[in-house]
A protein has these predicted regions:
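NAD(P)H-binding glycine-rich loop region in Rossmannoid oxidoreductase-like domains
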Residues: 29, 35-91
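Conserved N-terminal Rossmann-fold NAD(P)-binding element of oxidoreductases
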Residues: 4-9
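Residues at the starts of beta-strands that form the adenosine-phosphate
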Residues: 3, 26-27, 103-104
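Glycine-rich phosphate/pyrophosphate-binding loop and the adjoining helix
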Residues: 143-169
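Aromatic pocket-lining residues of Rossmann-like dinucleotide-binding sites
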Residues: 20
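N-terminal Rossmann-fold NAD(P) dinucleotide-binding loop
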Residues: 13-14
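Conserved Rossmann-fold NAD(P)-dependent oxidoreductase catalytic core, especially the SDR/UDP-sugar
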Residues: 91-132, 137, 141
Length: 169
């Protein structure tokens, strides 16, 4: 199957990692906190220390990845940090992905972050992916039901892998 990268592999990311592994995928998850790496590895995923606010720290994590899941819909930080994360940092990350093996993107477009920032991030993902003909899904599955979110996110990965994503969800 495919190698999936989960950028922002916190609580929901680990649930998704477990589901993707159960579906036969290899999974790599990123965390900014080295103490959280054990939680990622406990679900069977490869842990990588990397910060989406410092895109260069994610370069190694992109190696041999087919689908990237950008799960930053409930990221924390100051309003300025979150605005940069879902705009300039996201744009830099997408630009770096173009020249890699990534051929599908899932962007979490719903969460606790200001909906206007997530909408802008979703528009950026749509524009970059459509320009590059990379399948993408804007994940808008509510976060209150963990099981429903996990199933929706895993199905989004399948859609991106199948190439029939075109921004659905």
């Amino acid at each position: 199957m495919a190698r999936c990268l989960i950028i922002g592999c916190g609580c929901r990311g680990r649930l998704l990692a477990g589901e993707l592994i159960a579906r036969g995928h290899a999974v790599r998850g990123t965390t900014r906190d080295s103490a959280a790496a054990g939680g990622i590895e406990a679900v069977g995923a490869e842990a990588v220390i990397g910060d989406p606010d410092v895109v260069a720290t994610l370069a190694r994590a992109l190696d041999h990845v087919t689908v990237a899941c950008i799960l930053l819909g409930s990221a924390t930080g100051t309003p300025a940090q979150l605005a940069a994360l879902h705009s300039t940092r996201l744009e830099m990350l997408l630009t770096r992905m173009i020249d890699t093996t990534v051929r599908g993107i899932v962007y979490e477009a719903e969460g606790t972050v200001d909906p206007a920032l997530l909408d802008a991030g979703g528009a950026l993902v749509r524009a970059r992916c459509e320009d590059s003909r990379i399948p993408y899904v804007l994940l808008r599955t509510g976060t209150s039901d963990a099981a429903a979110w996990t199933a929706g996110a895993a199905d989004a990965v399948t859609s991106a892998l199948d190439g029939d994503a075109a921004g659905r969800r």
